[in-house]
């Protein structure tokens, strides 16, 4: 390392250092003399898994290029070690993460370059950290050991010299040195043909891009850039045979060199360069960040919004019978299924080019609910409607995007629709997973037969034919400039090793007042050209297929109140779109895995809407991954099964099997699944047995499942999570029922008794944990006593255990949540939340807190992102445009939780009194006009149908149809009443067996009139 060196810490004073060790992990900091300085020892014990942090307050203004250096040694095997820089909030972190950090007995150098310290998390996403307030060293993993450090230094590696410049020839008035100056100075060659301009830096310097400003009257016909290697040889890093625009920005990520050579061919004219500039390492530490830097320098709209480090929301489209998933974002960028590339629209009207940043943007769905999204550009005198659909299935699938350009002016006008294929994706870089996100390199583009072949794999065909097609190596502004005057095919093929190949198709039309034109762009796999040949019918056919697939919603509300039901249908459709064959997965790009908890939640949600087959297919596919001892993987994806200790899986699997059979009896499915369910039960019992030893008798862990990481907050340090236990309670009850269905009454009684025993231990544990931690709410785990209302909600919804838990603790839990939600509404002192909170709706209504439940429901409905697409990300940020991780979008598990919450507002089963509760979450505002209609809503007792409406200020009418099998505890009718119930008639006969809010029905059909308030 060369540069200005500063000693930051000789480790002779431990006072600035702080040891942080969450959970069961331990960390001791100590130091010892070592020559002229000291050694800092981090003695750590990570127990079964966790992390420790040594933090030092250290306010530093960092130079443009730098490196931290230390020496290290130690013992303890291989761990993950992180070197982190933190700002004053301690919430924004940049880090180097070494996942293979090995320790040995000898001192070895530890060099941490600025370019290796990257943004990790927080709200201040920047590539270069200019100032830090603390330094952290974290050790992650398991086991124990010692990490020893000495001699912490900061080296300033910035380049402040002036390069030596020479040219192959130069006019006397315009010498080579002029390229380092400012306009109007410039270098001009004295000769024609290829000329060279060489810059010698005098020492190695870091840069990541070269900016070349050309003279507008002397643009070259070709140019190339060479950089000098450490051994003095020149390597070509860029070559172009196309005439550039006034400025060329050549991205050269992570370049360190002692010299640069520009080769310029001015054609018949002499070569000329106005200025050459070098971008620092953080301008383009990689290809994506370089493009993002260029986007920030360009006018808004020239590049996709996400490249300008602003959030861009997207949604999915897919065929009702297919498996491909395409994306469209709110700006109209369409990403093909598989994420291979995307298509961007631009509109030229006269001399003006319109981009997404120059128009009003509107989002919509077909029928206001189908997964057939549209984006409308509203420009001056025109609109552009962008509507992608997936057609067909398997090898015969295709993406068809219809661009409808409409003229709204009073006189004819000529427009040009320009479709660009550049290496950009809808999926932002902050969503990157397994190489997907931000960009998709385009190495090869070929123009053929009115379309393009992309990377030798995908074909984009257009109807009608384009008026011009342009292909080039530059993915920046020069493509848009080339499209403006292009005629015919400008280039038939382009290859680019850097992956920056791009192409554009131009469609010019003169439109009269009120006229429209449709342009279709169809993307198929290589060799597949006619998935659905009639472009005009493709979109209507896709809509009809989705209407047929979703059927009629089992819930109907007044026209002005339809949003909850429309969102229900969209949520169901998104589950179907995001799936891959039998694999139900929560997202289209980032979460393309079948997490069992997500998948069962999605499958049971569809089953509640009458679509049981996806749940059965899921379980038949997932079941064979089970091991002989009953162990289940927590997740399965393209790489196979994942075997993390996530013990919620067992209750979830059993619940999925039972729900499928309760909602659609199927003896063959029962026969297939009962042996697996028995093995799941055996595994569940063996897990619980680990906490039945005498050593746990007087602890809060007795009788529970072992430590687990099924909750994301417990990944670093597994704990006894009550989430797992409530799922286990549900699973035990369900497998007892399954045993009875399988004809094993003895086993059914044994398991039912086991469920009662487990419930008793669970309640005792909760009481002990609350006392230990001194809390009045239901905790999320034994060890932490943590507040987690979203997880605890399943105690009332999934586990149906509300009657057994202390009411005061339940109210305290959800009162605290509601206070947090209210604070979010009234302040800016929060950053993000997760719409998993929709689970709390079902918990609140089961507590009889209808108004609170509806307040949460309506608040979350109002925060769909965007509202017109009726979807939620996993993470919703206060700053709508913050370039922050969303999880995935649409997040189908959240959509499934919404389906469960909304359907339970109309009907839910109650275990302890064997009843079916109706209308406990119905909003009184829904009773106006035609009121509420429930048609064949799936329940454990058969399809439920009823109607509910307000007759006048004091009377509510309800009609429950026959056809359902009445449960032993009857139907508990709990409609929204304007005042306490005063009188009630059933089929015209007065009844007196009611309370202030409900009546229990034991015979159908029943026509009930609820009379409320004081005597008239």
Task: Report residues per predicted region.
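Disordered, acidic Ser/Thr/Pro-rich linker "stalks" and the adjacent N-terminal cap
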Residues: 19, 26-35, 41, 155-207, ...
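Terminal accessory carbohydrate-recognition/targeting modules of carbohydrate-active enzymes
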Residues: 268-271, 275-559, 563, 911-1016
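Extracellular ligand-binding interfaces
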Residues: 44-123, 143-148, 211-239
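Aromatic-rich carbohydrate-recognition surfaces in CAZymes
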Residues: 407, 432, 446, 453, ...
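Trp- and acidic/polar-enriched beta-sheet ligand-binding modules for extracellular glycan
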Residues: 152, 192-195, 205, 216-282
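Extracellular beta-strand ligand-recognition surfaces/modules
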Residues: 2, 11, 68-70, 109-152, ...
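Active-site acid/base region of carbohydrate-active enzymes
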Residues: 469-470, 474-480, 552-572, 596, ...
